[in-house]
Amino acid sequence: MLQTNCPKCKSVIESPYLNELSSVKCGQCQEVVTVENVFVATRGFTIHREDLNNRISRYEKLLREVEAERTMMANDKTVSEKTSQSFDQFCLTLHELLEGARSHFRLKMTRELYLQMDSDHNKSKVKLIDISTGGASIECEMLDNLPRPKAMITLQMTLPKFHEPISALAKVVWVRRLTEESDAELYRIGVKFVNLDENAHTSLWSLITEGSVESSSFRAS
């Protein structure tokens, strides 16, 4: 969770969206104040967001090492349950810290929601994994035209409460294969939105802040 202190009453203001807001209303004194000095707070650990970003590569490396150690522990019957639980909590804390370092809040989908991806003049149906005003993660089976990193694609989506479909130009940042044993080849694709227009930004921000995932009626346009 992201936190900042109200300059008026000194109370703690919490919001997962602080990194995208220039001002926020304090729940204690009801004053609208400027967002400054944002902290990332996890269970038992708090760090200034700027300090975290300055050391982000170290925390990413630490997470990889802890996850590797946890994997080895899973195959070691001499490791106590308490130790395993502690490492699980440590991994969770590091994940929360890295999530707080992001420039945009990511809304993770809790149901299967599909979009249309236009890539190199081909249209494909893809599943939305998470989304922010900065980009998204999508999932699809192996395609003849599977986009590569740096490729430009267009995502077509229809959001609840908005009559017109949104068309978002995006650049592929990474592509990862998810399955090894299964017959179906599943891939996850991370994209960054390019020149998102004001209407699209407003629509996505509304979806994210309202958290209306369960009642959403996403569909491919």
Where on the chain are the PLM-derived regions?
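Short coil-to-beta-strand transition motifs
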Residues: 107-108, 121-123, 159-169
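Short coil-to-beta transition motif at edge beta-strands of beta-rich domains
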Residues: 109-114, 146-158
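Short, solvent-exposed secondary-structure boundary/capping segments
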Residues: 137-140, 178-192
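N-terminal helix initiation/capping motif
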Residues: 1-141, 206-221
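Small-residue-enriched segments and motifs
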Residues: 113, 126, 170-173, 191
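A residue-level detector for short acidic-glycine micro-motifs
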Residues: 130, 172-174, 195
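Well-ordered alpha/beta subsegment
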Residues: 195, 201-208
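Short, conserved beta-turn/loop elements at beta-strand boundaries and strand-helix junctions
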Residues: 118, 133, 175-181
